[in-house]
């Protein structure tokens, strides 16, 4: 553990096409083996499909999707007297975004469509309509937190 205090976080630069830091984070999450150009092309092509199919601004649809994916509560294991309890805690804003992006990419990869562009576009549109696997993951996380509400007093 470092003794010199906190290490400053590196600032994420907004992406060149939409000027959004969240889109940059999506591109970075999607990137495999350092191939950022390929990842950018996938995201921008998917956004083009989203804009074409919904008739709305792609960034607005993406932001709506992110709002529907990001969790408010999660559970954290806490050991008390030899027993492990799943303690519900609120999710910090930065972690909410990180989890939302992580789930979006994970469930995009798990989809059955042909081609990553199509998968990502469909998952974003589904999430914007409050359906899809990534939204289900958020709902499951919230259900888990709700079910373990009794252990909320173990919060630290």
UniProtKB/Swiss-Prot annotation:
Keywords: Ribonucleoprotein, Ribosomal protein, RNA-binding, rRNA-binding, tRNA-binding. One of its GO terms (molecular function) is structural constituent of ribosome. The keyword Zinc does not apply. SUPFAM superfamilies: Ribosomal protein S7. Transmembrane segments: none annotated. One of its GO terms (biological process) is translation. The keyword Transcription regulation does not apply. GO terms for cellular component: small ribosomal subunit. Part of the 30S ribosomal subunit. Contacts proteins S9 and S11. HAMAP family: Ribosomal_uS7_B. Belongs to the universal ribosomal protein uS7 family. PANTHER family: RIBOSOMAL PROTEIN S7. One of the primary rRNA binding proteins, it binds directly to 16S rRNA where it nucleates assembly of the head domain of the 30S subunit. Is located at the subunit interface close to the decoding center, probably blocks exit of the E-site tRNA. This is Small ribosomal subunit protein uS7. It comes from Clostridioides difficile (strain 630) (Peptoclostridium difficile).
């Amino acid at each position: 553990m470092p003794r010199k205090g906190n290490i400053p976080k590196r600032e994420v630069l907004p992406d060149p096409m939409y000027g959004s830091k969240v889109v940059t984070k999506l591109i970075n999450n999607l990137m495999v083996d350092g191939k950022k150009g390929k990842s950018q092309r996938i995201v921008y092509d998917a956004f083009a499909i989203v804009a074409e199919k919904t008739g709305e601004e792609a960034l607005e649809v993406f932001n709506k999707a992110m709002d529907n994916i990001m969790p408010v509560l999660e559970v954290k294991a806490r050991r008390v007297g030899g027993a492990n309890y799943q303690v519900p805690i609120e999710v910090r804003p930065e972690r909410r975004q990180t989890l939302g992006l992580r789930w979006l990419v994970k469930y995009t990869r798990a989809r059955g469509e042909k081609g990553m562009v199509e998968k990502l576009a469909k998952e974003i549109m589904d999430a914007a309509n409050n359906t899809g696997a990534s939204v289900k993951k958020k709902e499951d996380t919230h259900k888990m937190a709700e079910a373990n509400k009794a252990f909320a007093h173990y919060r630290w």
